[in-house]
Amino acid sequence: MSQTPNNLATYIWSLADLLRGDFKQSQYGRVILPFTLLRRLEGVLEESKETVLAEYTKIQAMNLPEEAQEKMLLRTTNNLSFFNVSKMDLSKLGEAGIKDNLESYIQGFSKDAREIFEYFKFAEFIGQLNDADLLYKIVQKVRRTDLSPKAISNHDMGLVFEELIRRFAEGSNETAGEHFTPRDIVRL
């Protein structure tokens, strides 16, 4: 598959095939968009992950408030505005305990990134996916998609998000022009 933004969006949107029957069409975007964002964030953080984890171990021993820890950790992220302190990634979640592992992984993100997942009510959908025995399947498909900056530029990734949001809006029966990229996603 050629990784043009449209082809990539089509591939990502094919997650909807797994959701059919267990989720309403209007809910597909509430699952697909945060998983896409999660995979992109994971790819962006790949280069600084080990440095952040090493620094986090040192900072934890200081018993500082979360805000102070975040300020210190942001210095180790290669000028990124977010980080993740979990040793997990999508490839390490495993099938047993995947719900708890994924929730823990998301809690490892810095506050601003976590707020985006909260906006999507992602924890609720993780539970529903787990109850429907779809969580592992979705994670496996998402993790096979390379959304790192080496594979797809920030501009093209923006186009992918726009296309996914457009499809989500169509599935939600919204009228044209009512969908947009949340500013938090653009800023990240």
What are these regions (language model features)?
Residues M1-L188:
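Non-catalytic, mostly N-terminal accessory regions of nucleic-acid modification and defense proteins
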